[in-house]
Amino acid sequence: MSKFNRIHLVVLDSVGIGAAPDANNFVNAGVPDGASDTLGHISKTVGLNVPNMAKIGLGNIPRETPLKTVAAESNPTGYATKLEEVSLGKDTMTGHWEIMGLNITEPFDTFWNGFPEEILTKIEEFSGRKVIREANKPYSGTAVIDDFGPRQMETGELIIYTSADPVLQIAAHEDIIPLDELYRICEYARSITLERPALLGRIIARPYVGEPGNFTRTANRRDLAVSPFSPTVLDKLNEAGIDTYAVGKINDIFNGAGINHDMGHNKSNSHGIDTLLKTMGLAEFEKGFSFTNLVDFDALYGHRRNAHGYRDCLHEFDERLPEIIAAMRENDLLLITADHGNDPTYAGTDHTREYIPLLAYSPAFKGNGLIPVGHFADISATVADNFGVETAMIGESFLDKLV
């Protein structure tokens, strides 16, 4: 019999809580990640007021320097810890895949100097559109459309760029390159980047609208991932007949593997929370696992190095956390975590190699406190333990610590 009938896992995309032990092996604009600290630096530089997460135990998580504006609770309502990544990567897919029990020992391919001519030529031949070569390099997603959007509006050329992550991104103005055409081109790009030396984690469609000087990316983003190389705990749950619900880009990240209810993409964090609440309220969702990604922290503020916006986004989530808690049933478990860091005060524009926080809450809890510091995959091991299925590759359950 399951200890919890339902588990709801919410990933606050990029909300790291301090540099990982191996952070100096990863860089941002040539600067090692060893001094990165997403929550710590936000708290220190612009202040952070998240009383509802603090109540569960956010301020109790062990750190060399406590969060400046998030106090420890003497009697928290839940359990807390931080988790370390073992996989060789700091991207979204690697983080989520490890959270679900995989160890990525060979990182996907990245292209610091842009994609090879062979790939660009193939995309041109398939699409009938030229590719803007000057954009073919690691680029900020907002800067690349500011720099090349006007040219695309004049010529219809494709904007193809990358980042420090193993991704190929295609930006297209919706009035110039229709969505169905953009998605079709991305599907082709996916088909030619499935093997080394160009094994990419994701192909991302990045549509935008507006006029030069005032471009805005839309919610019609699509991520085309590769399927996980080994079964995850999502697959184990699915095989056991236990319902799995995906909110936001989770279905894309796992390429649908192990997910039998895709609740759709998020237009915003707020929309994602609305969808989660709707999912939690489904009468037929009596037992199972929901998995939500809220990406605005990362996409809108982390990469853009906007500490004030990031803080406000955290405030907005915290203000809605009581709604999520109110939607829980007596034997539900809520887990709040992240997938990597993206320190908005740090060098560069890319993710940072950090610990991730873990907050656990249930109306059924009689106790509270700290869970031992562990690893990302401990989350999936705990989910597997609860529902009586096999774990994936790695992870140790902390289910017995939740009382």
From Swiss-Prot:
Disulphide linkage map: none
UniProt feature coiled coil, ranges: none
Broad EC category: isomerase
UniProt main location, coarse: cytoplasm
SUPFAM superfamilies associated with the record: Alkaline phosphatase-like, DeoB insert domain-like
GO process annotations (BP): 2-deoxyribose 1-phosphate catabolic process; 5-phosphoribose 1-diphosphate biosynthetic process; metabolic compound salvage; nucleotide metabolic process
Pathway(s) per entry: Carbohydrate degradation; 2-deoxy-D-ribose 1-phosphate degradation; D-glyceraldehyde 3-phosphate and acetaldehyde from 2-deoxy-alpha-D-ribose 1-phosphate: step 1/2
Family annotation (Pfam families): Metalloenzyme
Annotated GO MF terms: magnesium ion binding; manganese ion binding; phosphopentomutase activity
Gene3D superfamilies: Alkaline Phosphatase, subunit A, Phosphopentomutase
GO cellular component: cytosol
Tagged with keyword Ligase: no
Cofactor note: Binds 2 manganese ions.
Cell compartments where the protein resides: Cytoplasm
Binding-site list for Mn(2+) 1: 13, 339-340
Chain residues that bind Mn(2+) 2: 298, 303, 351
Catalytic activity: 2-deoxy-alpha-D-ribose 1-phosphate = 2-deoxy-D-ribose 5-phosphate; alpha-D-ribose 1-phosphate = D-ribose 5-phosphate
Keywords from the named record: Cytoplasm, Isomerase, Manganese, Metal-binding
Signal sequence bounds: none
Family statement: Belongs to the phosphopentomutase family.
Function: Isomerase that catalyzes the conversion of deoxy-ribose 1-phosphate (dRib-1-P) and ribose 1-phosphate (Rib-1-P) to deoxy-ribose 5-phosphate (dRib-5-P) and ribose 5-phosphate (Rib-5-P), respectively.
HAMAP family cross-referenced by the UniProt entry: Phosphopentomut
Name this protein carries in UniProt: Phosphopentomutase
Organism, as annotated: Streptococcus pneumoniae (strain ATCC 700669 / Spain 23F-1)
Lineage: Bacteria, Bacillati, Bacillota, Bacilli, Lactobacillales
